[in-house]
């Protein structure tokens, strides 16, 4: 452990950030003295929001968590290899959320590859809370684009921005 406590990195595209992401961030913040939220540029996924706007939304939505937990939470965009970004921000752990068994298979492989690239950085998995196990940014975008109600899946600011982005009032 580094001087001052554990530094964690929670990476994702956050396109958009969901209540499930916020749940994982809140729980990770209780484990770490500093938590970096890495917003992946990931143009290959065809993001709904540009990177800068995703960073801005994440910053706005996590502010109450940082205040409540007293944890330093930093939000940064990145477009490098995840392990290289983890090294850059001095993370000792990469935090990943798991919703279902299907998530585990992919995440297990990624954790193994990351360990091969830098065995000093651990991956820790946090299980999604029961009420958030089915939420994904992909489903949120699809439901919003098709006129469905996403208000129980995303926080208020993100709800407003997502509805505007898909052309809904």
Swiss-Prot record:
The keyword Transferase applies. The record marks 21 as: Transition state stabilizer. ATP binds at residues 13-14, 21, 97-99, 107, 132-138. The keyword Ribosomal protein does not apply. Substrate binds at residues 13, 45, 82, 96. Its main location: cytoplasm. GO terms for biological process: coenzyme A biosynthetic process. Coiled coil: none annotated. NCBIfam families: coaD_prev_kdtB (TIGR01510), cyt_tran_rel (TIGR00125). Homohexamer. Reversibly transfers an adenylyl group from ATP to 4'-phosphopantetheine, yielding dephospho-CoA (dPCoA) and pyrophosphate. This is Phosphopantetheine adenylyltransferase.
């Amino acid at each position: 452990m580094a001087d001052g406590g554990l530094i964690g990195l929670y990476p994702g595209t956050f396109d958009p950030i969901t209540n499930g992401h916020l749940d994982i961030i809140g729980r990770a913040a209780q484990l770490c003295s500093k938590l970096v939220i890495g917003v992946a540029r990931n143009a290959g996924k065809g993001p709904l929001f540009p990177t800068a706007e995703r960073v801005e939304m994440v910053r706005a939505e996590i502010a109450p968590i940082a205040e409540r937990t007293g944890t330093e939470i930093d939000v940064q965009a990145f477009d490098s290899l995840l392990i290289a970004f983890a090294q850059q921000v001095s993370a000792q752990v990469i935090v990943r959320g798991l919703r279902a068994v299907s998530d585990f298979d992919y995440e297990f492989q990624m954790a193994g590859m990351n360990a091969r690239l830098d065995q000093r950085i651990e991956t820790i998995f946090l299980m999604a809370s029961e009420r958030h196990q089915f939420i994904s940014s992909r489903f949120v975008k699809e439901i919003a684009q098709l006129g469905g109600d996403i208000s129980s899946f995303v926080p208020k600011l993100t709800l407003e921005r997502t509805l505007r982005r898909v052309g809904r009032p």
